[in-house]
């Protein structure tokens, strides 16, 4: 369904004043009739405050990628990692600026509709496909967390070794959780109160951050011994290779696993499909105000990511894994609470992520069709089976972070916003050789290079077996 203002019809106003109004106010080009109330974007006046919009966008940014950031720091060094993280944050903010500019000109409030405005129906299909792939990757990362953490939690409560009993195998448990919990929730016709789980997810990740900081000061250097384990148990999954026995932090380092670090960071900052819906709901919407929302949200997540990665790395140094929770003692009470909170959050988030995938598939494959329960159920079943098979076959969550962070993440952050800007902003307003369009072009080229280099190094690691030899 087209989401454009009929008065604008996706066309640029003839007068420059109208264009400036759209850039700054996200408003129709013509002012309201005398004595009437000003009409906000899309004839809808948002009621969400600035602070709540920041919270909503922070929820959209926050995800499972935070669990892999300490691993990324271990393979880049503290200073190099923080510099790369800052660059990704700044580039994400710039790409949101491009999206808001395009949306203001075209009068569109959906990422997919920008694709249609730029390239017609084919553009909408491409954008929807990229978003679906990214959400499938997010679902896979959530289910992988269940696969790796749920056996430890159940084994702790039952005083059993999670590696010894068949009913504690992660592959079996994710199938059980998918059938008994996720599938019934995914079959709901509307999200309802499931939409509030994003707030729960952010709360759980804040709890995770506080716990990581606390455990750093409690453990000191956790290399070679485990001060939190009960009855002198070893750290769960602590690798014996590559330990930094001196507990010295590396400021700059480069190794074969660095090909995963930037994709993990890119994966952690993707929020772009949710920017325009949040913009629509914003009270007193303007481009400048929404950009401020984005900057505050990205800045807050940068601080949270930086703290989590730094304290996680300074606890385990070069031995840290891509799924950092696996580094802590299985029986530590605080970490057990963190595991339970994270498991609850990711389990309830999976059906929330599944809803937009199903909606996009129905719009692409069955446009104009009335609601059908058999189709509704079939799409949910196929998606869950596909994701479960993917999670069972993939050896580490790092591979999920790496592949999605190297494909859909640069597409959503770098490539698509720059292409939209080049196609949607008319040459009468910004000539192709103007500095803003040259910047956008370079931004898109950077995204293509980032994708090619990351995928190239990852495939090389897989081909040479260095990924398995790393012990992660």
Swiss-Prot record:
One of its GO terms (biological process) is L-serine transport. It comes from the Eukaryota. It holds the Pfam family Aa_trans. The modification N-acetylmethionine is found at residue 1. It catalyses: L-serine(out) + Na(+)(out) + H(+)(in) = L-serine(in) + Na(+)(in) + H(+)(out); L-alanine(out) + Na(+)(out) + H(+)(in) = L-alanine(in) + Na(+)(in) + H(+)(out); glycine(out) + Na(+)(out) + H(+)(in) = glycine(in) + Na(+)(in) + H(+)(out); L-glutamine(out) + Na(+)(out) + H(+)(in) = L-glutamine(in) + Na(+)(in) + H(+)(out). It is found in: Cell membrane. Symporter that cotransports neutral amino acids and sodium ions, coupled to an H(+) antiporter activity. Releases L-glutamine and glycine from astroglial cells and may participate in the glutamate/GABA-L-glutamine cycle and the NMDA receptors activation. In addition, contributes significantly to L-glutamine uptake in retina, namely in ganglion and Mueller cells therefore, participates in the retinal glutamate-glutamine cycle. The transport activity is pH sensitive and Li(+) tolerant. Moreover functions in both direction and is associated with large uncoupled fluxes of protons. This is Sodium-coupled neutral amino acid transporter 5. Not inhibited by lithium. Partial allosteric regulation on ions sodium binding. The keyword Membrane applies. Keywords: Acetylation, Cell membrane, Disulfide bond, Glycoprotein, Membrane, Transmembrane, Transmembrane helix. One of its GO terms (molecular function) is glycine transmembrane transporter activity. Residues 1-48, 109-125, 188-192, 279-295, 356-376, 421-439 are cytoplasmic. Glycans are attached at residue 226. It is a multi-pass membrane protein. Belongs to the amino acid/polyamine transporter 2 family. The keyword Glycoprotein applies.
């Amino acid at each position: 369904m087209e989401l454009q203002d009929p008065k604008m019809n996706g066309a640029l106003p003839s007068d420059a004043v109208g264009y400036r109004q759209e850039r700054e106010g996200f408003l129709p080009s013509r002012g309201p009739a005398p004595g009437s109330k000003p009409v906000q974007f899309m004839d809808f006046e948002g009621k969400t405050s600035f602070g709540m919009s920041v919270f909503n966008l922070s929820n959209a940014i926050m995800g499972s990628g935070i669990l892999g950031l300490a691993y990324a720091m271990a393979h880049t060094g503290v200073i190099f990692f923080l510099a790369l993280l800052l660059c990704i944050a700044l580039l994400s903010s710039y790409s949101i600026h491009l999206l808001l500019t395009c949306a203001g000109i075209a009068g569109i409030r959906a990422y997919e509709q920008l694709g249609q405005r730029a390239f017609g129906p084919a553009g909408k299909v491409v954008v929807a496909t990229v978003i679906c792939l990214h959400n499938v990757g997010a679902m896979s990362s959530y289910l992988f967390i269940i696969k790796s953490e749920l056996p430890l939690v159940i084994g702790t409560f039952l005083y059993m070794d999670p590696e010894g009993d068949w009913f504690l195998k992660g592959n079996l448990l994710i199938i059980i959780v998918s059938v008994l919990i996720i599938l019934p929730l995914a079959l709901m016709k509307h999200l309802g109160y499931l939409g509030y789980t994003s707030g729960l997810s952010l709360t759980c990740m804040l709890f995770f951050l506080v716990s990581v900081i606390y455990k750093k000061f409690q453990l000191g250097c956790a290399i070679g011994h485990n001060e939190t384990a009960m009855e002198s148990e070893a750290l769960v999954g602590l690798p014996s290779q590559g330990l930094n026995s001196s507990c010295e932090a590396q400021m700059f380092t480069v190794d074969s696993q660095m090909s995963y670090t930037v994709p993990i960071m890119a994966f952690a900052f993707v929020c772009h499909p949710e920017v325009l819906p949040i913009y629509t709901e914003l009270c007193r919407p303007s481009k400048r105000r929404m950009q401020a929302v984005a900057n505050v949200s990205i800045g807050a997540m940068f601080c949270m990511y930086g703290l989590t990665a730094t304290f996680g790395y300074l606890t385990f140094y070069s031995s840290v894994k891509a799924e950092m929770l696996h580094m802590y003692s299985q029986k530590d009470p605080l970490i057990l609470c963190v595991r339970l909170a994270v498991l609850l959050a990711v389990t309830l988030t999976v059906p929330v992520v599944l809803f937009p995938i199903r909606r996009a598939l129905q719009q692409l494959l069955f446009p104009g069709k009335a609601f059908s329960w058999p189709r509704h159920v079939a799409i949910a079943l196929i998606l869950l089976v596909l994701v479960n098979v993917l999670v069972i076959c993939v050896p580490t969550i790092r591979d999920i972070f790496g592949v999605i962070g190297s494909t859909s993440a640069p597409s959503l952050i770098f490539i698509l916003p720059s292409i939209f800007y080049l196609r949607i902003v008319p040459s009468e307003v910004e000539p192709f050789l103007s500095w803003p369009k040259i910047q956008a072009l370079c931004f898109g080229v950077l995204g293509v290079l980032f994708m090619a280099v990351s995928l190239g190094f990852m495939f090389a690691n897989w081909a040479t077996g260095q990924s398995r030899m790393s012990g992660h």
